[in-house]
Amino acid sequence: MDKSNGLRVILFPLPLQGCINPMIQLAKILHSRGFSITVIHTRFNAPKASNHPLFTFLQIPDGLSETETRTHDITLLLTLLNRSCESPFRECLTKLLQSADSETGEEKQRISCLIDDSGWIFTQPVAQSFNLPRLVLNTYKVSFFRDHFVLPQLRREMYLPLQDSEQGDDPVEEFPPLRKKDLLQILDQESEQLDSYSNMILETTKASSGLIFVSTCEELDQDSLSQAREDYQVPIFTIGPSHSYFPGSSSSLFTVDETCIPWLDKQEDKSVIYVSFGSISTIGEAEFMEIAWALRNSDQPFLWVVRGGSVVHGAEWIEQLHEKGKIVNWAPQQEVLKHQAIGGFLTHNGWNSTVESVFEGVPMICMPFVWDQLLNARFVSDVWMVGLHLEGRIERNVIEGMIRRLFSETEGKAIRERMEILKENVGRSVKPKGSAYRSLQHLIDYITYF
């Protein structure tokens, strides 16, 4: 670790698994470059401070009831958090800045900046009131973050419903490489409340001092990056895949089942299909049964993450599946994906999961559910051609067929070869002189001299 540079960075993650992990990864990177780290966090989904003894953690009340913490409506959850957290956040930030001003001698540290998630829409005016630079951390693909702001316009232009079912495969010119049927799925899940929320994210991001993409690099987002720099007119840093700087490091909100690693050790190389749909997605009993039968019938060993509460019923079937594979409540995903036994990944295509799979060179079967997952799946299957896309209804024979195709010596081999090339390109980005490595150094220099 570099010697302390006398600067402190304040981080404020959204309390979601897909946001906390990247923020803590960024904290570790900055700390290794000499910055002191303070993490402000909510009571809900609080990170485990004991896992990170070198950081200072400050908890603020979030106003959520027990019922509200169990909601699957992410838009509602974010609305409630933004409504309840502004006052306690301002109070916490005031105390931090006053404390920094009162320090003297060798103990004195200057607070360089605030780094928080784009989903916090009150933090920009709060930071401005203290003349504190705010940088926005983003965990989406650049193209999604840039283009999803056109969704309210597309809603107004009446993409819903399609006049002709055959139009479903037509491209969406304003949002490539989405197809119209993908867009309908996104718009169908959206609401006018989310449109308003997205507009506020856009406004506060443009008013910020910079934009950090921790899970992407120029090799994955080059065209969108040049357009985003024109749109936002703020410095943009693409430093990902950020997990590569501290391999195996995790800030999971779930208890990890480490027994899956010894199980993988006993499997043949490239033989196991890993199945995980992230920390938020839930599936119904019918969908669960179709996936279960597909895995059972594929004759391929599998490791399946089935979170507690993520499946409606179907629990009695889980025991019967253990003879064909292994089922766990949560897995150390980065460690799993880099294991030599893993040959494929059946995924929801959250961006973090997609990038982790690319970084380890694991081909994917794409089963997107919501939001940016649909765009990410299109890039995997249609642009990079490093996976297969499950479209339409979830049916056992279709999933089984895709597993067989992915592990075949014909189509599967071609997919694996393309994935290996993409893996090498992304891997070079985080090495010295690589695009992400250079961008990280630019970020360090930028926040050092505020």
Swiss-Prot record:
Entry's Gene Ontology molecular function annotations: UDP-glycosyltransferase activity
Enzyme Commission no: 2.4.1.-
Keywords: Glycosyltransferase, Transferase
Gene3D superfamilies: Glycogen Phosphorylase B
Binding annotation for UDP-alpha-D-glucose: 279, 331-333, 348-356, 370-373
Pfam families, sorted: UDPGT
Top-rank taxon, per record: Eukaryota
InterPro entries: UDP_glucos_trans
Coiled coil regions in record: none
Family per similarity comment: Belongs to the UDP-glycosyltransferase family.
Name the record gives this protein: UDP-glycosyltransferase 76C3
Organism: Arabidopsis thaliana (Mouse-ear cress)
Species classification: Eukaryota, Viridiplantae, Streptophyta, Embryophyta, Tracheophyta
